Amino acid sequence: MNEQYSAMRSNVSMLGTLLGDTIKEALGEHILDRVETIRKLSKSSRAGNEASRQELLTTLQNLSNDELLPVARAFSQFLNLTNTAEQYHSISPHGEAASNPEALAQLFTRLKDKKLSDQDMRSAVDDLSIELVLTAHPTEITRRTLIHKLVEVNTCLSQLDHNDLADYERNKIMRRLRQLVAQSWHTDEIRKLRPSPVDEAKWGFAVVENSLWEGVPAFLREFNEQLENSLDYRLPVEAVPIRFTSWMGGDRDGNPNVTAEITRHVLLLSRWKATDLFLRDIQVLVSELSMSECTPELRELAGGEEVLEPYRQLMKNVRTQLTNTQAYLEARLKGERVLPPHDLLVSNDQLWEPLYACYQSLKACGMEIIANGQLLDTLRRVRCFGVPLVRIDVRQESTRHTDAIAELTRYLGLGDYESWSESDKQAFLVRELNSKRPLVPLKWEPSAETQEVLETCRVIAEAPQGSIAAYVISMAKVPSDVLAVHLLLKEAGCPFTLPVAPLFETLDDLNNADDVMTQLLGIDWYRGLIQGKQMVMIGYSDSAKDAGVMAASWAQYRAQDALIKTCEKAGITLTLFHGRGGSIGRGGAPAHAALLSQPPGSLKGGLRVTEQGEMIRFKFGLPEVTISSLALYAGAILEANLLPPPEPKKEWIEVMDLLSDASCDMYRSYVRENPEFVRYFRAATPELELGKLPLGSRPAKRRPDGGVESLRAIPWIFAWTQNRLMLPAWLGAGAGLQRAIDAGKRDVLATMCRDWPFFSTRIGMLEMVFAKADLWLAEYYDQRLVDKSLWPLGQQLRDQLAADIKVVLAIANDDHLMADLPWIAESIALRNVYTDPLNVLQAELLHRSRQQEHPDACVEQALMVTIAGVAAGMRNTG
């Protein structure tokens, strides 16, 4: 363990030294001395030295205004560099994830040991489907400018790992590292302006360009190698089990900045970026495919006998087509009215066919080694990314559709749709869906809100088929919510059937999800429309905010289990779409554990999951990390489908019902029923100040004047992560477990922990949260920021946290947290030394900021830096 970490620690230490040198050069020895003193006090404080802790508090409280920003920036930048070193470590020759592709080989060996046939395994590989949905949740706090520099730091660390470097080569790399650290120090880490939805979409395209474009074909090569070695099976060229979708530019739920016009623009921009990236690939193929021998079919396709280099000629034709398409899209993006070229690329087949013809010809002529080079990678990119690059989901809230149809029925004199019973709504919608005449009159002038809903449906109808992946309805509650969207799409003239996915996201809605889908599947028209396929989205973040993490996760499990059984009975292939966040309070969990803790059968229809904010960078920020992350996903899905987890025993279900109810009651007794809670939350966390951070394009609140219930799940989690109480990720869970112990179920809990992946994952997640939470820091925030009348409430919550930690350790039969994942414990310990001063400083800055009549620019800027720094230290924001 120590050996494995010594490489990472030495990289962290080296980057810290370079940062120290940079600070000294920029601001002088006295600032570096101050930073170093604080670091040593923090280290000693963490080791349990009370005198050092007091001195740390005093030192940070007494910083002058001139020292605030440099100190905050020093610790914040150090944590960014630590994250970079850790990310590199995960893919370096010393790290664990370096062996992730090998883990697939171990999985196949284990499956064979369990007497699974090669044919079973091949079938599971053929059915493998991973769709990752990139979302622009405002949790990526680090600026893109800095991310580029950190990626380059990663490259330098990789170069330094070569053993055969000459001195001048090593010196050159070190010089580049010094430059990068200095560039980062002299760059503002906080954005000045909030990104627009188009900026967010461009950030998503940058992830594709800088990482996924290389990472996906590289993963498929690794995967294919493991299949050949273990199963003597080759991945077919057309089989690309990975797709990427995006919510950036399509998710308008609670975000008035995402309009129909924005979605139209992002769709064009996405297609333009695809032509740009494919042009680079084709340019390489034009230069590489200089062979003359080919099949008669290919020669004819290339233009006949007189063509000397048929492959090259075909590639030049594709290049012309891409160039013409790009010019057309560019003109459209500028707002010009232009006629499309005769060879406009709108479908993946147009790209695939000439490339695949070259591939088949090369193989037929004995040039398989050439076929399986760059050409194969490009073919796989066509299958994975294609002409749209990333498909877009459109997401809108259910009441917006209800309001639009109600406005229409009132205009037509049919009554007020909104006030009708659910059965009347369904009857009306099915009647109209079966009708051949349009419902929306040509001359009708609806309100701006309704116009926007109708215009969005028109954008979908006009988009090339395959560029929109699904329409997600947030806060779906009843069958009419789904039928309403189908009617609006029909009225817009949508020529294809788009998957419409209800999103069930509160405790009540999760509990009713199966009933809603049973009703829908009972409608003949609906069954005919969906052609045996249904997508349902399970909301993790809002259900946890509504009921607490334990009750929410059990409701999610039960809902999924019921939906799987209902769809199986009806002969429907169900795709469950998981709306997980990066943090535990929003359903985040290490991918492998999360997937294996789903109900049996939940991954038969493939995996569709959101990848959010800063988690995109941690999992897909580099091609090598992408390979490792995709290997992890593929392995977990194959394992879950071939070795499904056990069905929970009746006794386990009863225990979960008991502790889920108890945990929900405890959670709501604070969050909903305690009249002091909202006041305490606003005082003890930087919730109000978070609104000033220009993070995402989406407002932090659904309603500006509301309480906790109107807060989006992300700022709710973000705020509690900052003050280290981490409340949404544990409140209620320990109380529920204690209730089960009091009911004499301790032995049952121990068995569940050992034999049931769902339960052991929940316990593991709680341990991780507890390891990141910190009682003395949470108490310090109270002392500096909270009115004394509210101190007892803070004390109650901290006492509850301390009690919960004991309960979880007892059930897990461990004497300290994270005993079975020492590398995570190591990572948290490494960061705490640097995160603690940022927390203390943040409390001090919040205190100063709230005392001042007029904002002090220096205090405000330093405060924003501490927020970014703590987020980096915790490795997640919301």
UniProtKB/Swiss-Prot annotation:
PROSITE patterns linked: PEPCASE_1, PEPCASE_2
EC code(s) of this entry: 4.1.1.31
Protein's GO biological process: carbon fixation; oxaloacetate metabolic process; tricarboxylic acid cycle
Catalytic activity: oxaloacetate + phosphate = phosphoenolpyruvate + hydrogencarbonate
Enzyme class: lyase
GO cellular component: cytosol
Molecular functions (GO terms): magnesium ion binding; phosphoenolpyruvate carboxylase activity
Cystine pairs: none
Cofactor(s) this protein requires: Mg(2+)
Statement: the UniProt record of this protein carries the keyword Transcription: no
Active site: 137, 545
SUPFAM superfamilies: Phosphoenolpyruvate/pyruvate domain
Protein keywords: Carbon dioxide fixation, Lyase, Magnesium
Function according to Swiss-Prot or TrEMBL: Forms oxaloacetate, a four-carbon dicarboxylic acid source for the tricarboxylic acid cycle.
Family according to the record: Belongs to the PEPCase type 1 family.
Protein name: Phosphoenolpyruvate carboxylase
